[in-house]
Regions:
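Positively charged n-region of N-terminal signal peptides that target proteins for export
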Residues: 1-4
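Sec/Tat signal peptide C-region and signal peptidase I cleavage site
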Residues: 24-30
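Early exported N-terminus immediately downstream of N-terminal targeting peptides
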Residues: 32-111
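A mature extracytoplasmic/lumenal domain signature
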Residues: 103, 129, 143-146, 156-158, ...
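Short beta-strand edge/turn micro-motifs at domain boundaries
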Residues: 151-180
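Non-transmembrane domains of secretory- and envelope-associated proteins
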Residues: 171-208
Length: 208
């Protein structure tokens, strides 16, 4: 699995100490996960059949297969609003709906374009969650373990039973990164400019 970005990688220091679910490898003796951690375990379970076949599938085929799992696991409406930031309030209802649609399509296409190979990686989910400092959510810690032993930590912020942000390497907010990127697009082209850019990027990814 190469070029992972949106939901990414990890490697194996102290994995045996985790009460965890491992997907893509024989299961460890594990504490049963509930709530937010179980939600992420189920998300990974849904992804794994397609990930294992990634090298034999086109980007469009992966996009089609990933879409149900991603849209079920992620609160894409909330993520869209948070990624846009303060300008969201200035968008008309029609523009908000169009941005939500374009952003959701882009997220799935982006993931499908990056998961392009599988060589024995496995996901690990820690059943012990961390309460969010504010907002009432929970942080779910996960790892994607490569055969080489490399680990990259991926934390998920779950509110109301669905993911609202992803922290790459445990600390880098995916939404904060996108908000910075979107700010210049919105400043020059407004909501319509953002919609156009997201649609173009999705199309470009799917055409690879």
């Amino acid at each position: 699995m190469r070029n992972l970005n949106f939901v990414t990688i990890l490697a194996a220091t102290g994995i045996a100490a985790l009460s965890a679910l491992v997907l893509g490898a024989p299961p460890l003796q594990a504490q049963e996960s509930t709530g937010a951690a179980a939600h992420i375990e189920n998300y990974y379970r849904e992804l794994m059949p397609t990930i294992r076949q990634a090298g034999r599938l086109s980007v469009r085929e992966r996009d089609k297969r990933f879409a149900p799992a991603i849209t079920a696991a992620f609160d894409l409406a909330t993520m869209t609003r948070l990624a846009v930031g303060p300008p969201w309030r200035s968008f008309s209802p029609a523009q908000q709906a169009a941005v939500r649609e374009a952003f959701s399509r882009f997220i799935v296409a982006d993931y499908a374009s990056q998961i392009n190979d599988y060589s024995g990686e496995s996901f690990v989910v820690d059943p012990q969650t961390i309460p969010e400092a504010r907002g009432g959510g929970e942080i779910v810690k996960t790892k994607l373990v490569q055969p080489s032993g490399r680990i990259v930590n991926i934390n998920y912020l779950v509110r109301g039973g669905r993911v609202v942000d992803v922290y790459l390497n445990g600390t880098i907010s995916d939404l904060a990164t996108r908000r910075d990127e979107f700010a210049s697009i919105i400043a020059s082209g407004g909501a319509d400019g953002l919609i156009k850019r997201l649609q173009e990027r999705s199309q470009g990814l799917l055409d690879r």
